[in-house]
Amino acid sequence: MRTADIAKRYLDYFAKHDHLIVPSASLISPNPTTLFTIAGMVPFIPYLMGEQTPPKRRMASNQKCVRTLDIDEVGKTTRHGTFFQMLGNFSFGDYFKEEAIHYAWELLTTSQDEGGYGFDPEKLWMTTFTDDDEARSMWINEGVDPEHIQKMGMEDNFWTTGGPGPGGPCSEIYVDRGPAFGKEGGPIADENRYIEIWDLVFENYEVDNVKSKTDLHIVGELENKNIDTGAGLERLAYLLQGKNNIYETDEVFPVIEAAEQLSGLKYGENEDADVRFRVVADHVRSALMIMSDGVRPSNVGRGYVLRRLLRRTVRSMRMLGVTDPVLPTLFPTSKAAMEASYPELNDTFHEVSESAYGEEDAFRRTLETGTTILDVAVNKAKSDSAEPVVAGEDAFKLHDTYGFPIELTLEMAAEQGVKVDEAKFRELMAEQKSRARADALKKRHNVDLSVYDDFKKTLVSPIDFLGYTDMSARAKVIGIMQEGKGSVPAVTGPANVEVILDRTPFYAEAGGQLADQGEILSDDGAVLEVDDVQKPIKDLIVHQCRLTEGTLVVGAEVNANIDLARRGAIARSHTATHMVHKALREELGPQATQRGSEDAPNRLRFDFQWSKAPAKSVISAVEERVNDKLRDNLAVTTKEMKFDDAIALGAMHLFGEKYGDIVRVVSIGEDGWSRELCGGTHVDHVGKIGMVNILSEASIGSGVRRVDAVVGQGAYDFNAREHALVSQLSDKLNARPDELAERVNALLAKLKESDRRLASMYESQLAASVPALVADTKNSAAPVKVAVKNVGHFGAVDALRKTVLDVRAQLGEDAPVVVALAGVNEDDKPMVAVATNEAARKAGIKAGDLVRGAAKVLGGGGGGKPDFAQGGGVDASKIDEALEALKHEAQKA
């Protein structure tokens, strides 16, 4: 029975028993404290807690889940996995214990021909809570052997949310896999032989003061009792398919088979390799499912977890001997295995897979660089101590400079028997974060958000934002703050202050839109220039000002006036951003979703999700589409409505942003050509924007692209500068504008030919110097024959390398030989290349060590292998000094 069919059979059974079948919720958790949906009951928590009314009192689902807490254990055992599916049936104040037990028993033991799973009743075992004799009796009434029912305490068989709320005893169902898997005695004796497949939670208590699973206070019985159950689909699948573990099921094992083909190895022949196979199978599936729900690789939150899954996959395949790209094989394999359960995977697979492949390419480059640097750090640690530890500074440099994750550093170091000073690494990371926080807080002129929290608690009513309709307003000063002093009653200028008004037309920076600027004038004569407006905490609008004249006091009546020209320019940019977003989606598809933006006077920046560079024709089409709509002068309207109604209309919203029940929808065009949830300011007709020119499109990270554009006056100014530049070039090159490209290409071709001839001349000069150098070195009576030469300009780096290796070959192996050539490359930077023969290496002379010393003299660095290394610097005047130092060091051996 396929996994998809096992799930369908479960849902069909409960649909027959009047349950509303709901689709799986997204893997992206609605709870801000968790990254992913980690349990089948998570989407139902509002109903279980009594916070919302369920659409029906009986419901069932197959919920996608991801848990990465034990990610390091994945593969080491066959029980751990990051992605899993949880079947569940729920009752919210409807049926209770007896029906839940009956449903579970009936579905498990009814024959497969009659719609059940066909488990042998003699192989089923139950656990109940110590005091729950009622559940025990109900199981016996269903036909369970009393000897197959075991009691467990609160640690195992009492469930709570982890805090105040519903709770109650649970009963777990196990399958006996037989004596080949462990000893007799039921789940209490051996949970490897007896595998848990289903947990029935009977929520009949209200609990609080939950300190641990065994330390809590039962307040009393719930008025409405709930049923919350969870059956692990993967466990059911491997038992019903006659397999030994989750990795051998139909939705997982195909990835292992694909990895076998890529590596040429066989699963089941070597435990170390098997661990890697299992890591790959699990992580590929998890990554595919996470990405299909909209997550993309990044350095924070869910994106970081995803990035780690993909990178562990690539690294595990490397440890299986595969250095070529692997995801183009593994991702389609996993999709094919999963699409019977999730046909929607096909809708986004092209964009998802391109993003994953791009992440693999980037990581392969990181891995090559980082591995070399880590090897140096590991070797250094081994040479310094009998109990080697990689310095925390080295681990931090790998992470900060080369993007090498600490988890990978720890893993790779451990494989070589070396520890990492993780405490020092964490200390350096904390220092870096502290610096970043301090920089961010400078913008708020305060370093302690509690000042704002304390002030907000004193507000009698919310601050009224008037800026959608009013450009100036009468207001009252209700708060004044100064850096280092917090809230103050009055300030005399000149001074930098933060001012809070009871009502304001000033827009605070949010949603990518920059803040308004302007002035605040008090009736008492105080003059304030408003430079910025921020919301340091929710619903608190803070004006960051320069008090240039007078004294400002709390309670003062003021006129607040925004800079109309700036507001208009920003509004034009913001509306243009919506239009660019819409046009991009028209050209690229619905996967091109917003990841960020900045709306500034006369310019915009728009970040969107896309895995590779769009064709230039696509960007041109986007620009043309936007300007066509500008000429149509579409109307821009705003309307507040319920969030669900807005989404039903097709309104776009920011990924990961939290919205209230009532949202503001900005629509462009009577037919809603563009609709977005947005709290920003906009023009009333797009014709007022004037023009949009897209200046550039580029990658800013894995799977994220950025468009920069100029808007309105910015676009007109740009076109004027472009016209002037074209005119200047036409005059200088004596060509019409339409001839410029051809003329420039001809000049570049001439320059390239000149460079080629120059490089050829340098190489000829370099080659001509070899015979004399070889002859002089052979005649040397020194125990170590050292050939050094300042070759001057040598052209391409490869020419220097080839010459060094050629000289080494001609000098042979009769004695230790070191060849060191230095000169100036195409960029006029000094470089040195060193080669050693086998006799020199046996004498302890390493090319890498010699290069590092010479490059240091040149003001740079370098390294390489014992037989060949190269490096460079910045001070070409010290080439002779560097070679002399190198020669002296080589002859010391």
UniProtKB/Swiss-Prot annotation:
Record's subcellular location: Cytoplasm
Binding-site residues for Zn(2+), renumbered to this chain: 574, 578, 678, 682
Top-rank lineage group of the source organism: Bacteria
Main localization of the protein described in the UniProt heading: cytoplasm
Cofactor binding note from Swiss-Prot or TrEMBL: Binds 1 zinc ion per subunit.
Enzyme class, spelled out: ligase
Database matches in PROSITE patterns: AA_TRNA_LIGASE_II_ALA
Reaction equations catalysed: tRNA(Ala) + L-alanine + ATP = L-alanyl-tRNA(Ala) + AMP + diphosphate
CDD domains found in the cross-reference section: AlaRS_core
Cellular component GO terms held in the UniProt record: cytosol
HAMAP family: Ala_tRNA_synth_B (MF_00036_B)
Domain notes from UniProt: Consists of three domains; the N-terminal catalytic domain, the editing domain and the C-terminal C-Ala domain. The editing domain removes incorrectly charged amino acids, while the C-Ala domain, along with tRNA(Ala), serves as a bridge to cooperatively bring together the editing and aminoacylation centers thus stimulating deacylation of misacylated tRNAs.
Function: Catalyzes the attachment of alanine to tRNA(Ala) in a two-step reaction: alanine is first activated by ATP to form Ala-AMP and then transferred to the acceptor end of tRNA(Ala). Also edits incorrectly charged Ser-tRNA(Ala) and Gly-tRNA(Ala) via its editing domain.
Entry protein name: Alanine--tRNA ligase
Organism: Bifidobacterium longum (strain NCC 2705)
